[in-house]
Amino acid sequence: MPVFALIDEPVFPSPHLAEPGGLLAVGGDLSVARLLAAYRRGIFPWYDDESPILWWSPDPRPILVPGHVRVSKRLERTIRSGKFTVTLDTDFAGVIRGCAAVPRDADNGTWIVPDMIEGYERLHAAGHAHSVEAWQNGELVGGAYGVAIGKAFFGESMFHRATDASKVAFVTLCRFLDRHEFRFIDCQQATGHLLRFGAVQVRRNEFLRRLEAAREEEGMVGKWVLPRTTRCASPQPTSESSPSAKQ
């Protein structure tokens, strides 16, 4: 299959035309319009600072139904202990930079390059990209971010600086998405971590079928907020050390 060079307009070729490894197109930009057009078709950017923007549509594709997330007894005890305060859309910039700081290969490189950070921050400002944060003693110690299109959520990356912080954040996000009837989380890559949480591999045709239905449902554009009763927390941090005071 050919790899398509994108034009100035925010349009994409059919994801069915991707190479066997999932690569579909090259070029373009990370404008809000182009990112939304990509995610609506199940396409996402993934590249490093030595390559142009690369756009992917893998086959198969790992997805997780939020209501089917598997949580071990030990992790459930940690969630209930109040060890972490969990919030949504409180420090998107901190989360995406925390994810970017995590080494992804033997060369300590990252695929979350500065242009990508800026692109997703614009998408967040437009109300389409969201973060979940785990706090401990007023410090950001873990989290994840992704993109919501209708009732589909596309998980991008997560990080942790304290044991179980990203896991608690992720489970809390899953339960929030389930409560709001999201159909699935696109995990993009099948890692052992996500498979243990209950992610399953589906073929591209099945993924796109699910996405076509989910994207037409009424979504949740704008800032997301967790009900206080689901924040997995002991008393909230004081105003001097609260997440909101850190921005």
Curated annotation (Swiss-Prot):
Its EC number is 2.3.2.6. Pfam families: Leu_Phe_trans. One of its GO terms (molecular function) is leucyl-tRNA--protein transferase activity. It catalyses: N-terminal L-lysyl-[protein] + L-leucyl-tRNA(Leu) = N-terminal L-leucyl-L-lysyl-[protein] + tRNA(Leu) + H(+); N-terminal L-arginyl-[protein] + L-leucyl-tRNA(Leu) = N-terminal L-leucyl-L-arginyl-[protein] + tRNA(Leu) + H(+); L-phenylalanyl-tRNA(Phe) + an N-terminal L-alpha-aminoacyl-[protein] = an N-terminal L-phenylalanyl-L-alpha-aminoacyl-[protein] + tRNA(Phe). The keyword Acyltransferase applies. One of its GO terms (biological process) is protein catabolic process. It is an enzyme of class 2 (transferase). Functions in the N-end rule pathway of protein degradation where it conjugates Leu, Phe and, less efficiently, Met from aminoacyl-tRNAs to the N-termini of proteins containing an N-terminal arginine or lysine. This is Leucyl/phenylalanyl-tRNA--protein transferase. It comes from Solidesulfovibrio magneticus (strain ATCC 700980 / DSM 13731 / RS-1). The lineage of its organism: Bacteria, Pseudomonadati, Thermodesulfobacteriota, Desulfovibrionia, Desulfovibrionales.
